[in-house]
């Protein structure tokens, strides 16, 4: 039987990310086109809305990831070096990664799994849901912080720096970045986490190749997406109220818009004023969002084979293995540093 001691949550935040969000919101709303930052959508309540939305029957990315993990987890586990530090960059969906953790345990791989998340309460819930008493070889811990905090922690923590590292990027996370920024982010991961033990360290990520607009739009307008999107405005009000004492946003004034961009090969999610120009509340009261003006908050890029090849190559990485299933547009890729 495993340890009865509860897994530890390490606070690795170099600064409280919440403090930077208001400035990011203001900068995005002053830009052209207007945008909202991703961090605004991942409050504790936002993450809970996201989890409910991503379980909708039409949200194929999650269902396909689980199908593949159930079928291929044993092979994936075999590709992860014994003694690895496994860092899950976004741990909200335990129902996915648990299949890989169980396969690592069955293979008697002595690894330590670190769940990383922005929300302390979500980390606590995730760890409580893991049946740790059923694991002997796999150990559990958690990291409270951002992606960048996690990468810096990996690079600077002497006790684990020289161990093999496996970074998990499930949930099509890399698709949320523009194509150039996705390559930069992967290169950043490699430079922080793979270079100390390049032959044994890797990134395990998912990408989506679906460019069928009807399937994509149906997934990204599934039940639960509207509460998820509007929760960001409530969270923004909470952050700004500390200074202004009034609401910046009225969620009733906005609606959610889902579009497929044929040219860029991506899904685009925006919030749009319902019926009139909107003057925001203090301290953003100098900003007006025009009627029908899109405030984009998220994109999901889809990757065909040539785009994948360019992404990995630009990042200085090579895919050494991949896993998918017939009928699935989602696939898992294991990436390692290109040999010098």
Curated annotation (Swiss-Prot):
EC number: 2.1.1.261
Taxonomy, superkingdom: Eukaryota
Pfam families, alphabetized: Methyltransf_33
Protein family according to the UniProt entry: Belongs to the methyltransferase superfamily.
Keyword flag Methyltransferase: yes
Keywords noted in UniProt: Alkaloid metabolism, Methyltransferase, S-adenosyl-L-methionine, Transferase
Protein name, as recorded: 4-dimethylallyltryptophan N-methyltransferase easF
Pathway info: Alkaloid biosynthesis; ergot alkaloid biosynthesis
GO molecular function: methyltransferase activity
Main EC class the enzyme belongs to: transferase
Entry-linked InterPro entries: EgtD_Methyltrsf_superfamily, MeTrfase_dom, MeTrfase_EgtD-like, SAM-dependent_MTases_sf, SAM_MeTrfase_EasF-type_put
The organism of origin for this protein: Trichophyton verrucosum (strain HKI 0517)
Function according to Swiss-Prot or TrEMBL: 4-dimethylallyltryptophan N-methyltransferase; part of the gene cluster that mediates the biosynthesis of fungal ergot alkaloid. DmaW catalyzes the first step of ergot alkaloid biosynthesis by condensing dimethylallyl diphosphate (DMAP) and tryptophan to form 4-dimethylallyl-L-tryptophan. The second step is catalyzed by the methyltransferase easF that methylates 4-dimethylallyl-L-tryptophan in the presence of S-adenosyl-L-methionine, resulting in the formation of 4-dimethylallyl-L-abrine.
